[in-house]
Amino acid sequence: MLRIAVPNKGMLSEPAWNMLAEAGYRLRSNPRQLVVEDPDNDVELFYLRPLDIAVYVGRGTIDVGITGHDLLVNSGTDAEEHMQLGFGASTFRFAAPNDSPITKLEDIEGKRVATTFDKLVHDYLVEHGINAETVHLDGAVESSVQLGVADLIADVVSTGTTLRNAGLRIFAEPLMHSEAVLIRSPRLEADDERLTILSRRLQGVLTAQRNVLMDYDIPVEKVSAAVDITPGFESPTISPLHDKQWAAVRVVVPKAKVNQLMDQLYEVGARGIIVTALQASRM
């Protein structure tokens, strides 16, 4: 069986579970379950701490896993990034107290930086020629400055609300941009059939999430103009209607552009324009 690690908690967990469910994999029915066998798909799911997933995959104990790009880099393991999964977008930033004189990267020299990602921060500071102490904490790093453990922090930022509520101010450029990724063990070949099937399914979910199915009727003489607006992946499906002066068009279009496309199609004569969500896909 293909052994797949998924986050058991945190911001990546629920989107990862949903994605696997939409890809047809069986999930746990009890939150206390740590391992789920899915014989129909020849996989085993292991619910692990997000911080540990890259370690297990890097050592070959687990074949593939879903984790954050930042967690992968910080792990320092041999696990390899296989594909981006389109959720969990975040940045990794420095933050200091609002009244702190620390306002730029150079000001970190000689300071204490609290973080869960000590390797990532250490490597970044060394790369920029800055000597500072990294203080490893397993969580809630935003409290470390107030408690006197550190002078500033480095942490994952999604909206920045938590930092602002803690009286912290973001400064300097992001250390890293991150999102959820599928990683694989160095012992698992990139063209392994089981990995190919998993990747194809996940890509199908991504495609379904980002696109919709659009149907509309168009006068025959306007078909070319309509196809220019909605060319689809390969080509739209065009079918004759009972009224020979009209044709029906079915095409996959980007979800983000639906309303603009509907406006453009209406302007060239399309009518009966409807949009349907996609559940799954293989493109």
From Swiss-Prot:
Localization, UniProt: Cytoplasm
A matching Pfam family: HisG
Gene3D superfamilies reported in the protein's UniProt record: 3.30.70.120, Periplasmic binding protein-like II (3.40.190.10)
Gene Ontology BP terms: L-histidine biosynthetic process
Cysteine pairs bridged by disulfides in the record: none
Domain of life: Bacteria
Pathway: Amino-acid biosynthesis; L-histidine biosynthesis; L-histidine from 5-phospho-alpha-D-ribose 1-diphosphate: step 1/9
GO cellular component, one term: cytoplasm
Keywords of this entry: Amino-acid biosynthesis, ATP-binding, Cytoplasm, Glycosyltransferase, Histidine biosynthesis, Magnesium, Metal-binding, Nucleotide-binding, Transferase
Mechanisms controlling activity: Feedback inhibited by histidine.
Catalytic activity, as annotated: 1-(5-phospho-beta-D-ribosyl)-ATP + diphosphate = 5-phospho-alpha-D-ribose 1-diphosphate + ATP
Chief localization: cytoplasm
GO molecular function, one term: ATP binding
Cofactor: Mg(2+)
Record EC number: 2.4.2.17
PANTHER family (UniProt xref): ATP PHOSPHORIBOSYLTRANSFERASE, ATP PHOSPHORIBOSYLTRANSFERASE ATP-PRTASE
NCBIfam families per record: hisG, HisG_C-term
Its biological purpose: Catalyzes the condensation of ATP and 5-phosphoribose 1-diphosphate to form N'-(5'-phosphoribosyl)-ATP (PR-ATP). Has a crucial role in the pathway because the rate of histidine biosynthesis seems to be controlled primarily by regulation of HisG enzymatic activity.
Family designation: Belongs to the ATP phosphoribosyltransferase family. Long subfamily.
Protein name, entry field: ATP phosphoribosyltransferase
Organism of origin: Bifidobacterium adolescentis (strain ATCC 15703 / DSM 20083 / NCTC 11814 / E194a)
